[in-house]
C-alpha cells in the first residue's frame, strides 16, 4: 500500500483525491476520466439517481456528487480498496450524497436517470458486454449513459455493439484517441432488469 494524493483541477472544481496501489490510474487522473468530466454531459434536470459504474477511487462520483447535490450518486466497483478510497474521497470533498457499493448491494428495483463510466475495457469483450447489459438495462425511461472509451481499445466496435443490441448510441465527441459515447435507454425496455 502506498497512499498518495493527486489533484483534479476542473473549471468548476479543485479537488485533492487520495489513491493507492491496486486501483485503476493510481498515479494520476486518467486522461479518459478527465475528458469525460470536462466534456461529458451534465445530469438531467431533476435527476435523483445517478451512477458511476466502476468508480475506482471516486473521481467521477465525487464530481457528480458536488455538481448534483440534490441527487444520490451511486459509486459501484468490485474492488474493495477502490470502494474504501472512493468513500474517503467523497467524505473529504463534502459529497455526502455519494453512496459507495458493491454491485450486488444496489437495490434491485433502483433505476438511474444517468450513468457515467470509463468502463474496464481490458476485462475482455464478453465480460464488458455483460457488465454494460446489466447496468444499461437499469436506466430509467429517457435515461442516458455517458461512456469514455479509447478509440484504439475498441470505442467504435463497442458503439456498434450497443447500437446492434438496441441502445441508440451517438459519438458525442472525440479527442486525443478517446470517444465520448452517449447511450440511450432501450425503448420499451427501460428499467427492466435482466
Which ranges hold each PLM region?
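SAM-dependent Rossmann-like transferase core, predominantly class I methyltransferases
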Residues: 1-47
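Class I S-adenosyl-L-methionine
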Residues: 1-2, 154-194
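Conserved beta-strand termini and adjacent loop/short-helix elements that scaffold enzyme active sites
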Residues: 20, 101-103, 172-174
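Conserved SAM/SAH cofactor-binding pocket of Class I
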Residues: 31-117
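Glycine-rich phosphate-binding "P-loop"
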Residues: 114-126
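Short "lid" loop at the C-terminus of a central beta-strand within the Rossmann-like core
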Residues: 121-123, 150-155
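A short glycine-rich, Lys/Arg-flanked "PGG" loop and its adjoining helix->strand segment in the class I
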Residues: 129-141
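Conserved beta-strand signature within the Rossmann-like core of class I S-adenosyl-L-methionine
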Residues: 142-149
Amino acid at each position: 500500500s502506498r497512499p498518495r494524493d493527486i489533484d483534479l483541477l476542473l473549471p468548476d472544481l479543485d479537488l485533492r483525491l487520495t489513491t493507492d496501489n491496486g486501483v485503476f490510474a493510481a498515479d494520476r487522473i486518467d486522461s479518459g476520466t478527465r475528458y469525460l468530466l470536462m466534456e461529458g454531459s451534465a445530469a438531467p434536470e431533476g435527476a435523483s439517481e445517478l451512477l458511476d459504474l466502476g468508480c475506482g477511487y471516486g473521481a467521477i462520483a465525487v464530481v457528480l456528487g458536488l455538481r448534483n447535490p440534490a441527487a444520490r450518486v451511486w459509486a459501484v466497483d468490485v474492488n474493495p480498496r477502490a470502494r474504501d478510497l472512493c468513500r474517503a474521497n467523497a467524505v473529504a470533498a463534502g459529497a455526502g450524497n455519494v453512496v459507495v457499493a458493491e454491485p450486488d448491494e444496489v437495490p434491485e428495483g433502483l433505476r438511474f436517470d444517468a450513468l457515467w463510466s470509463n468502463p474496464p475495457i481490458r476485462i475482455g469483450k464478453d465480460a464488458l458486454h455483460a457488465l454494460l447489459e446489466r447496468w444499461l438495462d437499469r436506466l430509467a425511461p429517457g435515461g442516458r449513459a455517458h461512456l469514455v472509451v479509447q478509440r484504439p481499445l475498441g470505442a467504435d466496435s463497442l458503439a456498434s455493439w450497443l447500437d446492434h443490441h438496441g441502445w441508440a448510441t451517438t459519438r458525442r465527441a472525440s479527442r486525443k484517441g478517446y470517444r465520448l459515447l452517449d447511450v440511450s435507454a432501450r425503448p420499451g425496455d427501460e428499467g427492466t432488469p435482466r
